[in-house]
Amino acid sequence: MLAAALMSAAFGAHAERLKDIASISGVRSNQLIGYGLVVGLNGTGDQTTQTPFTLQTFNNMLSQFGIKVPPGSGNVQLKNVAAVSVSADLPAFAKPGQQVDITVSSIGNSKSLRGGTLLLTPLKGIDGNVYAIAQGNLVVGGFDAEGRDGSKITVNVPSAGRIPGGASVERSVPSGFNQGNSLTLNLNRSDFTTAKRIVDKINDMLGPGVAQAIDGGSIRVTAPLDPSQRVDYLSILENLEVDPGQAVAKVIINSRTGTIVIGQNVKVSPAAVTHGSLTVTITEDPIVSQPGPLSNGQTAVVPRSRVNAEQEAKPMFKFGPGTTLDEIVRAVNQVGAAPGDLMAILEALKQAGALQADLIVI
């Protein structure tokens, strides 16, 4: 019966796997951060006279090896050392000995971390405990080059890099995965329709009352107490395919780049729109006034300005009841509206109450 239910769920028109639209409460990654030194740079490290914390960190490291820096050497210039921040994501269920990728970023005035080596750096969580140790050679995608005449070229970002598998996990994060007789599924996008369909799908497959919707974004599911059975149980649930509810109609506008995204369910109530362009041009054409001979006059520059205003007439187009996305785009393209004009039209439609969607400007 269980196999038949899974096979029937796979033939949904727009079905998505449960693992793609929801996550298990408490099963998540944790952010780690650390502070360390990158050495071995080819003269592109921090200018330690301007970043004293780099030199202080370097001296502290030497003292751990029993090396004492003589007094009065605070102005030493180290060109191959850079102070960096190290960040990583500790995956859920990560165990000691496993490797995780890390990102290394300069926090001083280093020009490039290319060719550098990160020295042993502890990575801490928000609770202050050390969960991983990082060290290794950096992989930097960008580079920086400068000529003697001051000409300079920079490709990508040379002041940051990554170390694949550069951190070793030293401590695992406690998880409540095996606690209690139930699990909570959190939807990536809250939707009452999607939550109801998930509950119905699970209950149809496993029996009434197994799944209960807490709200539009969370679902409580009864789970076995045995850890092994719980893993098998979730492997079935996460591959269950559900038809998610349609998203709320939205129009997203990026005012900086001119990008406009119109959702599938966006419609317009009856409205008539016209959009014209007014261009004002001001030109300066000064003339020189030259007095006649023996007139005791002085040469003067007389300003002369010309102001010209041109307005490009645009035809009016009409939206009927329930106009769809395709009709909106077709009508706007017919009048040759630029992205900036389309933004103004959509904002005006929203103010008029004709745009049946959320207008979001980012």
UniProtKB/Swiss-Prot annotation:
Keywords, sorted A to Z: Bacterial flagellum, Periplasm, Signal
Cellular component aspect of the GO annotation: bacterial-type flagellum basal body, distal rod, P ring; outer membrane-bounded periplasmic space
UniProt-listed GO biological process terms: bacterial-type flagellum-dependent cell motility
Residue spans making up a coiled coil are none
Give the location in the cell.
Periplasm; Bacterial flagellum basal body
Which Gene Ontology molecular-function terms are recorded?
A: structural molecule activity
Q: Which residues form the signal peptide?
A: 1-15
Subunit relationships:
The basal body constitutes a major portion of the flagellar organelle and consists of four rings (L,P,S, and M) mounted on a central rod.
Protein family: Belongs to the FlgI family.
Role description: Assembles around the rod to form the L-ring and probably protects the motor/basal body from shearing forces during rotation.
Q: Which HAMAP family match?
A: FlgI
State the protein's name.
Flagellar P-ring protein
Which gene produces this protein? flgI
